[in-house]
Amino acid sequence: MAIVSSENRTCADEKLLALYQSWSYIASIVFNCLVPTISTYFLGRAIFQLCNQATIQYSTRILLIATILFAACHQVSYFAFKIDLLHTMFFKLDQPCFLQRSSYDCRFISIAQTTGVVGMALTGLAMSTDRALALTFPADYHKLKSVPRVVLSVFVFIVSFSTWFLLTMNDPLTGYLNHCGFYPSYSVANFQLMLDVILYLAIFNLIWDVILFYYARQQILWRRSYQFQKRYEARISLNCTQAVFVISICQCISNGANSGLMRLLMMIGTSITSVTYSSLLSLFYTAPYSCILLPILMMRISEYIREQRTIGILSLRSEKPGLEEHHQRMRAAWS
């Protein structure tokens, strides 16, 4: 049985001490520290590019930047607890009964980690909601200007930051953990529920994004206009929906995989050793790798949209739709 947390301080067994002294495990922890370090560069570049990207609608850019900030929050907490674990492995192995950390000592890392994970999941839903409002009520959405994005961003921030406090409301934080990467001892069941909710949310968001993308494609035909400005706005709206679609799909897959694998690990934790549990944790916890791929994906999509914008402008300028062609496109849209 894996003892990764306990109500009282417990001494590390010989197998766990051997794991902490293993150079292969030390190398894996060092690699884990490099991942958030490298991701910081890409996260910064992605924010800079989004701030200077005029082809993506402003509300969408705000939510994309919020996603990056939540990813950065997660990476900082992940780096902190890995560094703390390295410190334990190098300097505290001569005190096997004092290797564990209290849930109270780990609270700041746990808060940041939970905020980052929940925030990334909710911003995906917020982006889809923003796109749904923009596609369904374009005139009203334009009049509201910054209201939708402000409301969605504030909602996501409040829920993400308060999640940890709600889950640990009845936890005195007096339990002990092998390291700060584990959930508080008395709140494990609540965090399991959180992982389940994130998994179901990812599945729901995936289905919703597919519907939104199909609807955006159809809108190009439904709202075909002879005016260049309206056709251009329709193209921009579709491009933003494409960006949100691709990013949300990747987020849904990564959030679903991370939540599902972590939930599985917590289920089988009672039948495996602490050494096996610690080894599987580094493999199953995929959120850090998602955080390094997310900004790279955003930058690639931003470049793609910029190219499509140029192609779209050239094609719209050369487009001379006739009345019969307009009717044919409308009939095709409704068929």
From Swiss-Prot:
Residues 44-61, 129-149, 214-235, 300-335 are cytoplasmic. It is a multi-pass membrane protein. GO terms for molecular function: G protein-coupled receptor activity; olfactory receptor activity. SUPFAM superfamilies: Family A G protein-coupled receptor-like. It comes from the Eukaryota. The chain crosses the membrane at residues 23-43, 62-82, 108-128, 150-170, 193-213, 236-255, 279-299. It is found in: Membrane. Residues 1-22, 83-107, 171-192, 256-278 are extracellular. GO terms for cellular component: membrane. Keywords: Membrane, Olfaction, Receptor, Sensory transduction, Transmembrane, Transmembrane helix. One of its GO terms (biological process) is detection of chemical stimulus involved in sensory perception. InterPro entries: 7TM_GPCR_serpentine_rcpt_Sra, Nematode_rcpt-like_serp_alpha. Chemosensory receptor that negatively regulates RAS/MAPK signaling during vulva induction and the negative regulation of olfaction of volitile attractants. Required for the suppression of vulval induction in response to food starvation. Signaling acts through the GPA-5 G-alpha protein subunit. Belongs to the nematode receptor-like protein sra family. This is Serpentine receptor class alpha-13. It comes from Caenorhabditis briggsae.
